[in-house]
Amino acid sequence: MFTIEKVLNGRINHPETEFIPVTASTTYKKGALIAITSGKAVLAGSKKATHLCTEDYTAGASDTHHIQCFILSDDVILRTTLTADTSLVKGGMSAINTTADEATGAALATGKYGVEIVDLIGTKAGSEILCKISDAVGASA
């Protein structure tokens, strides 16, 4: 799960929220990174995250619910865990898992978004990292 560690602007402890329409037949978890596609919330996975989900919700096939999400910006520092051991260092870019709720510790695949590591509390699976949303996209080697 991604949680908000701090906001670097010095004015507020948490970013603003907004309500975003759900995508049909999608399961959202509190702490998952969210992207917007066709005006609806989707799990960020390999897309650029713009929001952080604040509730657990499973959307039905013709659901019209709106989930509440924090708006993420460059000054929002997040805390999460690694799904696997990593050799990445501070400033490195980590992919996020398919449920968009943890960093994998793997480098970004070509054309995919992830998170920038701000600090590592550890490098083993289950260790915590501090990170922020990245504008960088993985490139081929």
What do these predicted regions represent?
Residues 1-141:
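Surface-exposed, low-hydrophobicity beta-strand/loop segments enriched in small/polar/acidic residues
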